[in-house]
Amino acid sequence: RQSSSKLTQPKLMKLTPTRELAIQVAEAFQRYASHIKGFHVLPIYGGQEYSGQIRQLKRGVQVVVGTPGRVMDHMRKGTLKLNGLQALVLDEADEMVSALKEGLDIIIKEIPKTRRTLLFTATMPGTIKQLIQNYMSKHVVHIEADMETVGHQGIDHQYVVVEPIEKLEVLLHFLNSKEGQRGIIFCKTKAAV
């Protein structure tokens, strides 16, 4: 939907569990909407000065991409007005619910009930089912993808669960054992790299 520069309150908010993901998603939004005059996306996350975020919120943004903690901080300060919110996207909801459930509850209770909610999750634990039951419409559309439709059949997916102190040693052993092969290693946060 095209946006006019008169819109000052966010119409869409996407919550992510980490600042790195918030930055990545905000940059993607900005690229996709670069042709829309007056369209502004603001990533809000901890570790960044409030003053710059507040200045941009006052100027007006159509999309906020943030972490629950910083979103709640702005809500408490009254610098983030969400009464015009039309859509809420919970990205990696299983990660957020396991670590940030109270924050999600606070945010969701404060935003308009008429909003559209999209929830993306890799797993469907009971906490996600409870979140759906408590805060989403009774007309939920559940879309499930399995590895046959998502993953390439020629790719070998592997994972190893280890204690945090063992991660580097196990990773080095794994990389050395796969010499000459290519792969992608995903880490939860930038700090973990």
Name these PLM-found stretches.
Residues R1-V193:
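Conserved helicase RecA-like core
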